Amino acid sequence: SIEQGAGVRAISGDKTGFAYSDEIMMPALLQASSAARAIARHGNEGTLQAWHASGDNTLYPALDPLERMTAAEKVALLQQLDTEARAQDARVREVIVSLAGVHEIMLVAVSDGTLAADVRPLVRCNVTVIAEQDGRREQASSGGGGRSDYGFFLEEDRARGYAREAVRQALVNLEAVAAPAGSMPVVLGPGWPGILLHEAIGHGLRS
């Protein structure tokens, strides 16, 4: 299953055992725990402390983005971004807009008694634009996201900003000229420039 599951890690000395289960049911969890313990067994028995909740450390709201915007509202937002991008310049030929959201709930139980949960929303919006001029086609993308719901893209006109930025970059690419190529002198100072030289040609020469 790619929607739910549990992982177990057992550590004993320098040995570590891993096991997982696609089912969040007690028999499956006990079986995974036994498998991980058998892998890491080192001749000693560990003890399990009484569970206690970890302190509250909220970094972002525990929202479910999948339920906070209807399908019709999502389609309307995508259409707005398509319209915004095409309105920027007549050279825009194609607009590809995507909207994605994830809602994960994690529970971590440690043998020292720590019991911690994390509700993790994640949203992403991306706009790709293809522009054409005199038979030349160029494309560019812009987007953003964060651990919030889809309302994040409506704040401060963020989503429309992605569309405008994608168009701007595509138009810059239309006017871009090829970088000079061929042999040319390169002067490098001591220290970090050697790293640049290594990364630029060293790996290729080594292979």
Describe every region a protein language model picked out.
Residues 1-207:
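Active-site bordering "gate/hinge" segments
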